[in-house]
Amino acid sequence: MEKFVVNGGKPLFGEVNISGAKNAAVAIIPAVILCDEPCQIENIPNISDVTLISKILQQMGAKVKRINKSTLYIDPTHIQTSVAVTDYVRGMRASYYLLGALCGRFKKASVLFRLPFLVNILF
């Protein structure tokens, strides 16, 4: 493990903002599908995968709004479909996270997702 050793007579001080982790964000956002009321998720990085999964949810009927650069508001109450088959799904490897949430809400799911070896599977 790496570490920093600071030698000297001046103590360190200040603030550091830590951005949310990409892999955690794309796993947490689909879980909103299971909610029966709007959710606000904070510390979400402003990256393309978050934008893609937001667009997927919007196409499924959710209302998604970025409140500021690190906060996402999602209202999943209008999602009426267990199908997530769009060009956005094809462009994102982590779209398989939608499977569990859709199965949990609708007891079935159809998600076209891209595996690293470029095989599309429909569940």
Indicate where each model-derived feature is located:
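Structural preference for solvent-exposed beta-strand-turn elements
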Residues: 1-123
